[in-house]
């Protein structure tokens, strides 16, 4: 069963009491992110109905579920998503969190497409260079949009929750990540962010850490979407898709090992894409670490459980660190 990006249903509290894994007494207005549970050896799945909830015999083919451990080695745990759905899944932020969850699945699918493109090119079935070029645009664009989704989450949380330090006056935060970290196109220092928006130093430091990578991501996307710049030349080699080792912004990421660069100066685009996805996810994880020391959150919705992501394309996400560390090509 596919349970990704399902619409939010209203279910009576009394009906939710039949799900033994939920801490109904401490919901505090939060929504339930999934009714899929894996408890050691057995799946438990509830479906909203007009009468409340109905237990059914099902398991997720693609989607997210609660468990004490992954049911499959390929099921992914992300601290950011687990924290948000367990402790901050209010209706005002749920759709943004769900959009980030969906983007993670989409990035896995997008990365896996390159294997299809590579095999199709080797078999001379299609001209795949432009396939790769447009997919690179998609990955950069999706990662860029995830920062704005994250900022929507931050702004909504900021308006609705209590700070540990209640002497700090709260202001409304912009819903654009760019406005939080850039001024006149330049990265703002942590102290300037703190002064501009009246946020705690810990949160301003988080924005400062994320700003430089975000600025590169934004500039690449804006050059293509808003300024009419064509994507960098993508080369098709026997080992997969490549760019010149001098190509920016890719060269500035410093992800290529010298022994993986071809004699003609071409380097695999694969570790570049891995780097972009890794840094985007790290920024989300960093936020989860930071915000827990600033905002008072209710306890876990499903105590003792974690959220795991199941997808058809998780393997690409699991391999990200290895691909980046080893400057891997598609024939590796």
Residue ranges and their predicted role:
Residues 2-102, 126-137, 151-332:
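Acidic, Ser/Thr/Gly/Pro-rich intrinsically disordered interaction regions
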Residues 143-145:
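Loop-centered beta-sheet repeat module
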